[in-house]
Curated annotation (Swiss-Prot):
<protein>
    <recommendedName>
        <fullName>E3 ubiquitin-protein ligase TRIM32</fullName>
        <ecNumber>2.3.2.27</ecNumber>
    </recommendedName>
</protein>
<comment type="subunit">
    <text>It self-associates. Interacts with DTNBP1. Interacts with PIAS4/PIASY upon treatment with UVB and TNF-alpha. Interacts with AMBRA1; promoting activation of ULK1 through unanchored 'Lys-63'-linked polyubiquitin chains. Interacts with TICAM1 and TAX1BP1; these interactions target TICAM1 to TAX1BP1-mediated selective autophagic degradation.</text>
</comment>
<dbReference type="GO" id="GO:2000786">
    <property type="term" value="P:positive regulation of autophagosome assembly"/>
</dbReference>
<dbReference type="GO" id="GO:1902230">
    <property type="term" value="P:negative regulation of intrinsic apoptotic signaling pathway in response to DNA damage"/>
</dbReference>
<dbReference type="Pfam" id="PF01436">
    <property type="entry name" value="NHL"/>
</dbReference>
<dbReference type="GO" id="GO:0005776">
    <property type="term" value="C:autophagosome"/>
</dbReference>
<feature type="repeat" description="NHL 2">
    <location>
        <begin position="417"/>
        <end position="460"/>
    </location>
</feature>
<dbReference type="GO" id="GO:0042594">
    <property type="term" value="P:response to starvation"/>
</dbReference>
<dbReference type="GO" id="GO:0005813">
    <property type="term" value="C:centrosome"/>
</dbReference>
<feature type="modified residue" description="Phosphoserine">
    <location>
        <position position="337"/>
    </location>
</feature>
<dbReference type="GO" id="GO:0045087">
    <property type="term" value="P:innate immune response"/>
</dbReference>
<dbReference type="GO" id="GO:2000147">
    <property type="term" value="P:positive regulation of cell motility"/>
</dbReference>
<dbReference type="GO" id="GO:0009411">
    <property type="term" value="P:response to UV"/>
</dbReference>
<dbReference type="GO" id="GO:0005634">
    <property type="term" value="C:nucleus"/>
</dbReference>
<feature type="modified residue" description="Phosphoserine">
    <location>
        <position position="330"/>
    </location>
</feature>
<dbReference type="GO" id="GO:1902173">
    <property type="term" value="P:negative regulation of keratinocyte apoptotic process"/>
</dbReference>
<dbReference type="InterPro" id="IPR027370">
    <property type="entry name" value="Znf-RING_euk"/>
</dbReference>
Length: 655
């Protein structure tokens, strides 16, 4: 009871920090996950150190303090004896109990009863386990016999493992062959599509020529009729002038003239009807929606017992699993491709390595004029499609709408501050933004590196709040659905939640959770906050620019302060984060991560797994955001621009 009461008062978070590796988030053990001490005093498991040491040259960089431990082998590092003592003490009583005699529990066993399957000491064997009812033998002999049995089973399992590996290799060969066939069919479809486009272009040219001939013929008839109408109009005007002159004559002269003049018929030569050519569109040769072709399935049998040799297997295969066929096939043969499993589609796309997001255009270039950037470091998109960019090199926040540049926000000191600084000949304070976000109330939150503060502006550029209390080095900022701002404190190791009023400034602030060097932060529609931990460095950051230092792993916390989903440094067997420099969450709750050292944009679905959205075209991505219309904006720091990509992923179901 006393032990249970003592266990109930343990701080589980503190115990987790001591007994878990902060990189792989696995508990320390005395073997593979043995705790090792770096020269800086931090503890990392042996398995993670092996991976870090294999990918480095000069030593191991601590993910917490960035100090380098210069070693060439793990034997140069000492064990953390304190952690090992805790592990050994926690399992001491259980381990000792497992070693004792099963009968009395007080003496070490020397005999093994094969009939009962228990280990016994000599007194217990002589008392209760005598032959012929029991078959006993020394523990060492029984153990050797059991080891021989296990050795035989191990040999059979290894043979089975080898067979499974061969089958797996054959399956990979089949997968490569299928991918090649898919691409070939897609290329064939593209050729057929281009041929039909050429046919459509020729058909349009012929159609427009025929339409032009009809238009020319009708124009001649209309022009001839217009000519006759103009002549009749001139004659009518001439007769009007003639009669006006007659009306103005004197009475005697008017009466003396002969009145037997006949009135000419002006409209006699005008045709009553016009013969024109009417035109209408007659659809020929096609009924229903236009389709280039359809994917047709054929049965195909692959012998998994035989070895599969990639291209040789593809060349020797007699029938294809998917073929391209023209639209003149029978309806029974049609099998639309969308019936394929979403999970299989996902795996095939990941294997093909095709970039999922297409580049559309880029916005901005290096400069100081409106719409230009100089080392931009943060990006945010509002619900009204307004884009906010933290332009660090130009000491400003730029706001863009759908039409282009809208306005900029700079730091404007008070009158007395400006007067005193100008009088003393000092430089005026600048706004050095590190991160920017806007809440649902239209307030813009900015973390300022100039004085390590949180500043809140209106859209008009008026500063309504400036908060420095409890903040050592504020960096990342995001806005919760409730309108609160969440700010990360890199040196303080905390995430702070601020409630800001437009008239009163910061009215409430509290600590959301603690973390190891949290830097970049984002949140989803439910209020779950994702933040980076540790310290990852961009390998090309030769000038030690702090804004190019990123995260080492990703953690999450709910609005109630409960820790949630974690993505460790080694997010895959052969993949790891190098320098996380930006994050955002899409409408489905999937996490999108920008790694400035990998120069890639990674996608982590809510149900698990990962994929690479953008592999090429980026020099140093430091910020990402999604627009309401489904476009992915990537802020490229060293290219001084915002690059716009398409983002319309297929909605896969979780397998």
């Amino acid at each position: 009871m006393a032990a249970a009461a003592a266990a109930s008062h343990l701080n589980l978070d503190a115990l987790r920090e001591v007994l878990e590796c902060p990189i792989c988030m696995e508990s320390f053990t005395e073997e593979q996950l043995r705790p090792k001490l770096l020269h800086c005093g931090h503890t990392i498991c042996r398995q993670c150190l092996e991976k870090l040491l294999a990918s480095s040259i000069n030593g191991v960089r601590c993910p917490f303090c960035s100090k380098i431990t210069r070693i060439t082998s793990l034997t140069q590092l000492t064990d953390n004896l304190t952690v090992l003592k805790i592990i050994d003490t926690a399992g001491l009583s259980e381990a000792v109990g497992l070693l004792m005699c099963r009968g009395c529990g007080r003496r070490l066993p020397r005999q093994f009863c094969r009939s009962c399957g228990v280990v016994l000491c000599e007194p217990c064997r002589e008392a209760d386990h005598q032959p012929p009812g029991h078959c006993t033998l020394p523990v060492k002999e029984a153990a050797e016999e059991r080891r021989r049995d296990f050795g035989e089973k191990l040999t059979r399992l290894r043979e089975l493992t080898g067979e499974l590996q061969r089958r797996k290799a054959a399956l990979e060969g089949v997968s490569r062959d299928l991918q090649a066939r898919y691409k070939a069919v897609l290329q064939e479809y593209g050729h057929e599509e281009r041929r039909i486009q050429e046919e459509l272009a020729r058909s349009r040219k012929f159609f427009t020529g025929s339409l032009a001939e009809v238009e020319k013929s009708n124009s001649q008839v209309v022009e001839e009729q217009s000519y006759l109408l103009n002549i009749a109009e001139v004659q009518a005007v001439s007769r009007c002038d003639y009669f006006l002159a007659k009306i103005k004559q004197a009475d005697v002269a008017l009466l003396e003239e002969t009145a037997d003049e006949e009135e000419p018929e002006l409209t006699a030569s005008l045709p009553r009807e016009l013969t024109l050519q009417d035109v209408e569109l007659l659809k020929v040769g096609h009924v229903g929606p236009l389709q280039i072709g359809q994917a047709v399935k054929k049965p195909r049998t692959v012998n998994m017992e035989d070895s599969w040799a990639g291209e040789e297997g593809a060349a020797s295969s007699a029938s294809a699993s998917v073929t391209f066929r023209e639209m003149d096939m029978s309806p029974e043969e049609v099998a639309p491709s969308p019936r394929a499993s979403p999970a299989k589609q996902r795996s095939s796309e990941a294997a093909s390595g095709i970039q999922q997001c297409l580049f559309l255009k880029k916005m901005g270039a290096k400069g100081s004029t409106p719409g230009m950037f100089n080392l931009p470091v943060s990006l945010y998109v509002t619900s009204q499609s307004e884009v906010l960019v933290a332009d660090r090199g130009n000491y400003r926040i730029q706001v863009f709408n759908r039409k282009g540049f809208l306005k900029e926000i700079r730091r404007s000191p008070s009158g007395i501050d400006s007067f005193v600084l100008s009088f003393l000949g000092a430089d005026l304070p600048n706004l050095t933004p590190l991160s920017v976000a806007m809440n649902c109330h239209g307030l813009i939150g900015v973390t300022d590196s100039y004085d390590n503060s949180l500043k809140v502006y209106t859209m008009d550029g008026h500063c309504v709040a400036c908060h420095r209390s409890q903040l050592s080095k504020p960096w990342g900022i995001t806005a919760l659905p409730s309108g609160q701002f969440v700010v990360t404190d890199v040196e303080g190791g905390k995430l702070w939640c601020f409630t800001v009023d437009r008239g009163a400034g910061v009215v409430k602030y509290s600590c959301l959770c603690s973390a190891v060097r949290p830097k970049f932060v984002t949140c989803d529609a439910e209020g779950t906050v994702y933040f980076t931990q540790g310290l990852g460095l961009n390998v090309e950051n030769r000038q030690n620019e702090h804004h190019l230092e990123g995260g080492f792993s990703i953690g999450s916390v709910g609005p109630d302060g409960q820790l949630g989903r974690q993505i460790s440094h080694f997010f895959s067997e052969n993949e790891d984060f190098r320098c996380i420099a930006g994050m955002c969450v899409d409408a489905r709750g999937d996490l999108i991560v920008a790694d400035s050292s990998r120069k890639e944009i990674l996608h982590f679905p809510k149900g698990g797994g990962y994929s690479v959205l953008i592999r090429e075209g980026l020099t140093c991505p430091v910020g990402i955001a999604l627009t309401p219309k489904g476009q992915l904006l990537v802020l490229d720091c060293w290219d001084h621009c915002v690059k716009i990509y398409s983002y319309h992923l297929r909605r896969y179901s979780t397998p």
